[in-house]
């Protein structure tokens, strides 16, 4: 069985790398995990995870995409597929590969060929009206994570209003309010991955892989 591939997308500074860090800290104790990060000109996110995270360096690959980060996760994902191939050859028993995109806008989505599902991260500091702006990533991602809730009172954001807007824009798709840095509700993200990606994703891989 192939490892389940989970995309982590979102604008620059929304907390993607912090989320990957927290998820790997929790999940590496029970699952065989690896990570691919996408940066335009550097491997900074990969280096952060190597330096500060819990995974061995050989389980983390940094991809330098150049140009538009959107292209590397959708139109031409060849560099990411090469990294996946590398990791699956290194580790025959991988359960999960997290693929973090470079920072992009609300229209950035992952190719369904590249990932089995993806989490899109926004943060409250982007403004209370961010959910109303829509965009495919915000409305159609498998899970929307609204991060940095602790900043809400400092940036004039009413989380109740934001919740109503998110609910309307998501049309029944799941979303979670969280504060990743303080680990608030990271457990809910883990539960979502376990129930909606590892179980359903494994079934999909078995059917198509």
UniProtKB/Swiss-Prot annotation:
GO biological process: urea catabolic process
Organism: Lysinibacillus sphaericus (strain C3-41)
Domain of life the protein comes from: Bacteria
Function: Facilitates the functional incorporation of the urease nickel metallocenter. This process requires GTP hydrolysis, probably effectuated by UreG.
PANTHER family to which the protein is assigned, alphabetical: UREASE ACCESSORY PROTEIN G (PTHR31715:SF0)
GO annotations of cellular component type: cytoplasm
Gene Ontology MF terms in the entry: GTP binding; GTPase activity; nickel cation binding
Subunit-level organization: Homodimer. UreD, UreF and UreG form a complex that acts as a GTP-hydrolysis-dependent molecular chaperone, activating the urease apoprotein by helping to assemble the nickel containing metallocenter of UreC. The UreE protein probably delivers the nickel.
Protein family per UniProt: Belongs to the SIMIBI class G3E GTPase family. UreG subfamily.
Keywords: Chaperone, Cytoplasm, GTP-binding, Nickel insertion, Nucleotide-binding
Binding, GTP: 10-17
Pfam families: cobW
Localisation: Cytoplasm
Listed name of the protein: Urease accessory protein UreG
């Amino acid at each position: 069985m192939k490892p389940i591939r989970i995309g982590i997308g979102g604008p620059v500074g929304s907390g993607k790398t912090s989320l990957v860090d927290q998820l790997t800290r929790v999940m590496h104790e029970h699952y065989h995990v690896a990570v691919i990060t996408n940066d335009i000109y550097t491997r900074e996110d990969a280096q952060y995870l190597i330096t500060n995270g819990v995974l061995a360096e050989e389980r983390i690959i940094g991809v330098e995409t150049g140009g538009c980060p959107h292209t590397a996760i959708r139109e031409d994902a060849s560099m990411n597929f090469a990294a996946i191939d590398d990791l699956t050859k290194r580790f025959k028993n991988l359960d999960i590969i997290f693929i973090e995109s470079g920072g992009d806008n609300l229209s950035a989505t992952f190719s369904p060929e590249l990932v089995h599902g993806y989490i899109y991260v926004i943060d409250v500091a982007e403004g209370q009206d961010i959910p109303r702006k829509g965009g495919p990533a915000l409305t159609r991602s498998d899970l929307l994570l609204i991060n940095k809730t602790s900043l809400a009172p400092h940036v004039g954001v009413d989380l109740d209003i934001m919740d109503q807007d998110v609910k309307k824009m998501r049309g029944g798709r799941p979303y979670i309010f969280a504060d990743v840095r303080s680990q608030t509700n990271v457990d809910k993200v883990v539960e979502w991955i376990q129930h909606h990606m590892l179980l359903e994703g494994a079934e999909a891989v078995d059917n198509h892989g």
